[in-house]
Amino acid sequence: MAPDCVGPEVEALAKTLQPGEVLMLENTRFHAGEEKNDPELAKQMASLADVYVNDAFGSAHRAHASTEGIARFLPAVSGFLMEQELEYLGRAVANPEHPYIAILGGAKISDKILVVETLLAKCDKLIIGGGMANTFLAAKGLNMQDSLVEEASLETAKAIMANSGDKLVLPVDAVIADKFEAEANSQVVAVEEIPAGWRMLDVGPKTLELYKRELSGAKLIVWNGPVGVFEMPKFAEGTFALAKLLAESGATTVIGGGDSASAVKKAGVAKQMTHVSTGGGASLEFLEGKELPGVAALNDK
């Protein structure tokens, strides 16, 4: 283990390496120039090697000295994991098989407006769950009571629904709670019937039946974001049941990183998925159609 990632001592250690040996460098973010994509820092790191291999897809959306800058000074290629990420996520962006079903969850629509619009242009159905579904349901005129609703995104949600035809699939029932706590009282109600003082924390059984029907016959399923507060056992059933539906679907299944990857692992079905991405923000930006700096810098993509 080197004491730093650049400098005379690191250079000396690099020169002593024998074939088959590995020198692990210190965290590049200990240098302020890393996140600033400082060309001098990138050049110093490049001086330690003959070839740069980027296998960190999860950092590919960041233009840092160790992801984008260094590639200006060395032959730069992708590693096997990076290659796999680009292959499977690339299918969803460039040449998806149909029927193509996309699933988006998570808390906020504001974080995923661009990916919603991009997916609607390519997929056959877009299933919306999680906290972001509350905003769509509120935009339809439903009283979501104490559920998380992004008031500032209501008009955006209305516009998306107006332009989506019959592609958008929203929850029809919900597991609700009287407080946002693991031990809260809970019950299942239709999304139109949430009582005052309660909030939606998971999708209900009728919604899961709807998901099952929509996923039937799919050739490609891309999932990013849980459909409930799966960190709390009482409100994890929807997310885990959805993971199992994907595992049994027979489709090519691509799981976005972050919470979705954690969910399929906790559900015990990660090995039954075609591809579980290691990139949270990176996979989302890739699905939005953005060019990732760490990928664009490579000689082979």
Name the predicted role of every residue range.
Residues M1-K301:
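Active-site loop-to-helix "anion-binding N-cap" substructures in soluble metabolic enzymes
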